[in-house]
């Protein structure tokens, strides 16, 4: 079992709860309440900002030029379609301008932002990888249901499409390989710290989804 497999197994509880969360299920069913979805997208925008900052730290902390390029290419993609989607979706959902320009973070959003910010500030490459992997692997699993038809609503369908597909699968596979590689030379204490960080990220991502219904 690889180290990334170990982390995924350790986070099995919050992982299962997040990938079958009410919000995810309702998106797949095409019946999520517009107000709740709009509120969630506002919170996603707050997280996206710190997520991009963390990607910048990962770019700076990379130990291999080819890895730095892979991170940089992905950061450019995240700054494009996902950010554009949030703006368009909030237009369609009539999210008030004040909520977009002066958003108030929910408690779980604030905690997730704090985690992203602290890992960014530390600029430790394996730690950056652990958080990025937990976040995006969880997104991929949430948006992957081989036997399910995607929703017909274009906003909901695009929300899923941004979290899956060959390019996104390749990104998650890259993060797994990088974390497996960079963690191989670490001692048990450092690997345990990465395991705890991965688990904490999964727990906060679950709490972040819960925030849509508070």
Language model region names:
Residues 168-198:
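Long amphipathic all-alpha helical oligomerization modules
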Residues 55-62, 119-120, 143-150, 182, ...:
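Secondary-structure edge/capping motif, primarily at the C-terminal ends of alpha-helices
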Residues 1-24, 165-177:
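Acidic, low-complexity proline/glycine-rich segments
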Residues 193-214:
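Acidic, carboxylate-rich catalytic segments that either coordinate divalent cations
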Residues 12-18, 31-61, 127-141, 209:
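Alpha-helical bundle segments that constitute or directly flank the non-heme di-iron/ferroxidase center
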Residues 42, 66-170, 199, 203:
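Active-site-proximal alpha-helical scaffolds that flank and shape metal-associated catalytic sites
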